[in-house]
């Protein structure tokens, strides 16, 4: 049995199969849950032992607790700074004291995010890199394992060394990745000692890099961040496994896609000769592997797909997509002109389906990620419709409606304004936030935000790796942060932001006015030129079968024009709503996104707890697998608690707490309990799904998603620091911020020109606590609801046999696990059973 600190064998990584459906259990992670308010999640482990030889102080209300002796270590756990000061000033303790487990007060303060306590201890001479605990780790490593970003910043500013390794070979970067905390990872990667390839790709005792750990955990955001900083996708561990091999072990589609897009070697073989594809077949994650490669246009063997029109965003595909809707709409209108309407309708539906099939299955690649949203398909439909309306006006209405010159002139102006602003809204930049020019500049930004206690998802974008301006949002389709982001509009194939919002509003307004003028001129055209409809005397031979005589007249005289007019009238159903909503929002100095957030989350700036959710990364990680998890439920409960802490609606919707399987179970249970209504419920679900899709297509889903509609009610009473009245708001919109002397692309703080008296300040969610140290959102967390995002297939009890180096599932198959040998290394010499560390305390 290996003693702690002994180099670990790579035999734990030998290939065997594991199901990618059930999330395996990581005993090391579950044992390393956070120490909160001095309460150890492993107080009762091994008959009350905490795994390091003594029981950690607990805050449970037990008889005689008040009589327990106060030590500097228990005070540091609780963040009781006055008690620490009394102990130090009286000489009863020093900042260098170690407890029975060789742990310093700074370790306990760091693991519990007691920032003020950490600062006091360091100011009074505490050793910043003191090593202690069973795993012989530093305070920086304790804080890193729990993702306490502001403790990390304090320790690093006092000279803590991120490259120090514990007895398992983990440095601060590895442990930050283990925490799945995003902002701490961003901060750690800015440290000079980790910025070089040697630091970024440093390995643990088994040769695993931080990228391998992130891939193994299915942590797509951490994988993306590491790749953006230059992590090596070709590096191998002690068993010859690359990061792609470990991503396949987890079966996370997002991680596999990111690594493949970063040119990872898909044909790399580990020591036993298996490629990532071979392992995917063996571990039953081949489905995720295939879909991940298809997302970026690759075949299963890694070859680029050979398509006639190339990728969905290629120039050839975009040109073909622009042509097909125009031609298809012409065929549809011609069908109505050639056949009776009741015969033409099914043919027109078939032609419409054919158009959609050609675009989405022949021209575009349906297997690419977000292929339809990233294409110009809907822009082509709008442009083709405008072209046919203009053709009918030039070809028929302009010359056949004498006496209506003013209406024709007004329509011509509307057509020109609409077409030009559609082109401008689709082609110009929506107002992207600037990217950092260099890694040095990025380091300065991250360090400054961390020092200010503002390094979170609302101020820093981990996708752009740049500062995020106020009122901006990162668009996953445009892959940039858009200043004063309104929404991503499929009809212009572009984001709507400060740079093109004015053109978008002119386009929608001119479209509504132009359609109304076109419909009026169409009615005049039929009134002047079409002979009155004369129905047949014998109704049994009637061919019109329409409710209004005017429609019969129009179909008899010029059905092609009628088809174009009805198609144009159909667009009024959503453009009028959109125009009214946009005009109202402009007068209130709000965007569509802000109105939506106001209804769903209670304030304009974004999601309550957004920075915390972004740091813990539980949404992205579990959506990649689409499976329910106990840790996900625990995290969701904590997020709901944060919502309540901010005074938001207790019934606020959180869409991440129900996995696919769990949702299906709930549906089936409901159907069983109400069998007589099962068909009705099915129809309701189909209607809800289809209506949701239609709303997303026309861009109105932001008003209906969850409780977004309530934003329209709350907006009138919402505190908005940018709202300066109707006239000023309209001038600011038209001048793109110049009227308020603002540059929205670089607006990081409220300027003096914007009155702070209008603003209701929402505090940032940080993992720091006050000098009292009693906890905020951390306080009520029980050990049972441990927020574990790192799991493995190993069982809680190890087989003592030296031959049983790999865990085995119920079917007798061995499992892949990066933790297997680490568990064995945690056994003390001569121990018959492994005493696993059950908190970051033993990660010392």
From Swiss-Prot:
Active site positions: 489 (s-palmitoyl cysteine intermediate)
InterPro entries assigned: Ankyrin_rpt, Ankyrin_rpt-contain_sf, Palmitoyltrfase_DHHC
Entry annotated with the keyword Chloroplast: no
Cytoplasmic side: 1-318, 361-377, 430-503, 581-844
Topology of the protein relative to the lipid bilayer: Multi-pass membrane protein
Keywords per UniProt: Acyltransferase, ANK repeat, Endosome, Golgi apparatus, Lipoprotein, Membrane, Palmitate, Repeat, Transferase, Transmembrane, Transmembrane helix
Gene Ontology cellular component list: early endosome membrane; Golgi membrane
Pfam families named among the record's database cross-references: Ank_2 (PF12796), DHHC (PF01529)
Coiled coil: none
Ranges per topology, Lumenal: 399-408, 525-559
Region annotation (Disordered) ranges: 18-67, 789-810, 822-844
Ranges occupied by ANK repeats: 65-96, 101-130, 135-164, 168-198, 206-235, 239-268
Catalysis: reaction(s): L-cysteinyl-[protein] + hexadecanoyl-CoA = S-hexadecanoyl-L-cysteinyl-[protein] + CoA
Class of enzymatic activity (EC top level): transferase
Entry note about domains: The DHHC domain is required for palmitoyltransferase activity.
Function: Palmitoyltransferase specific for casein kinase 1.
Protein name (Swiss-Prot/TrEMBL): Palmitoyltransferase AKR1
Source organism: Mycosarcoma maydis (Corn smut fungus)
Gene designation: AKR1
